[in-house]
Regions:
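Signature of the catalytic double-stranded beta-helix
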Residues: 1-49
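Catalytic core of non-heme Fe(II) oxygenases with the double-stranded beta-helix
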Residues: 31-39, 44-49, 55-129, 133, ...
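Residue-level signal for alpha-helical context at structural boundaries
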Residues: 51-52, 93, 106, 143, ...
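A short hydrophobic beta-strand segment most commonly corresponding to one strand
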Residues: 74-77, 129, 145-160
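Ligand-binding loop in jelly-roll beta-barrel domains
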Residues: 123, 139-150
Length: 176
């Protein structure tokens, strides 16, 4: 299996005046996302690192097949496409919950079977919402001089949610 390699810029490194932070905290945007995902209300993450991130993939970088943490959905905004590679691949509904993994399906994806893997074209400005906790997904290896830059937005179903310190330590190298 290919190892993951990329850089993550956490929310606390962005100015409150940055376009990404303004979009994230803009009530009409959050209301729009709530309607799409079928939630009556969504709340900003209270974690200092997780609300808004930018994932940076340079030449040779990629993400391995993985699930996101146990959230209702994953939302990403493509900021800049790679010169080559950096393709988003998704194997939908490879599990129905953290405890209910379809091992045959997962094994087929990890062994290279492509019949149930979807390739999602990502152009700058494109917003993608998917069930990252239930769908195995990855980004293929990036090539060329131009980095692939993608924003990730984390909203919660209840107010005041702080992310898992183990996840923060693993992803950002620090807890807060």
């Amino acid at each position: 299996m290919n190892p993951a390699r990329y850089r993550m810029i956490p929310a606390d490194l962005f100015s409150d005046r940055s376009s990404l932070m303004k979009l994230y905290f803009w009530d009409p945007f959050r209301d729009f996302i709530s309607q799409i995902v079928g939630e009556s209300e969504l709340y900003p993450s209270a974690d200092p690192l997780q609300p808004v991130n930018v994932i940076c993939y340079g030449p040779g970088d990629q993400s391995a097949w993985h699930y996101d943490s146990d959230n209702a959905f994953t939302m990403t905004l493509m900021l800049q496409s790679a010169e080559a590679g950096g393709v988003f691949e998704l194997a939908p509904n490879t599990r129905c919950g953290i405890e209910e993994e379809n091992l045959e399906y997962v094994s087929s994806v990890l062994s290279g079977e492509r019949d149930r893997v979807h390739t999602v074209s990502r152009t700058p400005g494109e917003l993608t919402i998917f069930r990252g906790c239930n769908s195995l997904h990855r980004v293929t290896q990036v090539a060329g001089a131009r980095e692939r830059l993608m924003a990730v937005f984390v909203y919660e179903k209840t107010p005041g949610v702080i992310g898992d310190p183990v996840v923060n330590q693993t992803v950002y190298g620090r807890v807060n």
